[in-house]
């Protein structure tokens, strides 16, 4: 689970940015922007996309419950198409991408409304628009991994060179209400495809399952856990989506569902594994009161 904070040399500091909690049914988000009008744009888009998804699930209830890849990628609604592509790429059900996909739609709506910075945290699945060309600085996203040894840490993510929306998504088998068939403390994915980041985080968390450690020494537990971490990371490293459909915003790089795993982190207890391009670790004040959750 992660939580956002931000630094910005342009003067739009964390104190000046607006942070608002919003809940609609199961969707519980934290929205960050420089102006309240962009917050409203995100809320409207969340309601719109939830309605599209609910109508589709009403017509085909199995879509909302299956844990397996969806065999046919629908052309519309777009939220369902993107969720299906992401779930299929990760080898799991399409609902594994719901939080990240909704977050990415909300951020795209904020950008269309004129936002120069936008962030939506949907229960640890975060979509971000933070380009350097808009005067933005680095963003610090904290890590909350329950009772693991990795406390008061975060990632310092530099502003993007391109005007894109990217994802930082987290799954946990020990923290939060989301479904996980593993018991990792935190499985974190970085990707320019937010839906893929969400599904891949779920798949990575599922891939780490440890049991029967009662009779092992501490050294044996550590060695076994590290091997399981490495195995799980190897299972997800080649996930990718290649989508040729023109993006709905008319600006494909901004809000594309296409992407690969740019980086991944898996944490269990005092053990950690990292692959790919992962931002710098920094000390962070990870406050429970600002982590996105039901109230």
What positions do the PLM features span?
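Ligand-binding beta-strand-loop-alpha-helix segment within the catalytic cores
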Residues: 74-97, 106-115
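Short, Gly/Pro- and small/polar-rich lid/capping loops
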Residues: 1-9
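Short acidic-hydrophobic catalytic motif
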Residues: 2, 44, 188
